[in-house]
Design a protein with these regions (language model features):
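Alpha-helical interaction segments
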Residues: 4, 15, 26, 54, ...
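Feature detects long, helix-prone N-terminal segments enriched in hydrophobes
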Residues: 11-13
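A short, structured beta-strand/loop element
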Residues: 15-51
Length: 78
């Protein structure tokens, strides 16, 4: 599970084997984990992350979208 980025309490990472899903990023904090599709950006799931933290994570996904997408494709060789 490679970590791509850390910002504040958030860790942005991929799981190594999720072949049937579009480009996405998992975002974890101490409360749980949420997942965002990267292009276009959309919340794909949330397990325990407080709503205000989900919004903050989404803002960070927008801010780092280019990096996250590049790292996703680099890792998954697409």
């Amino acid at each position: 599970m490679p970590t791509v980025l850390r910002v504040g309490s958030f860790r942005f990472h991929f799981y190594s084997h999720e072949p049937n899903e579009p480009a996405h990023i998992h975002v974890r904090n101490s409360d749980g984990e949420c997942k965002f599709w990267i292009d276009p950006i959309q919340l794909a799931g949330n397990k325990g992350v407080a709503p205000h933290d989900v919004r903050q994570a989404e803002r960070l996904v927008f801010e780092y979208q280019t990096l996250l997408l590049a790292k996703y494709h680099e890792y998954h060789r697409r």
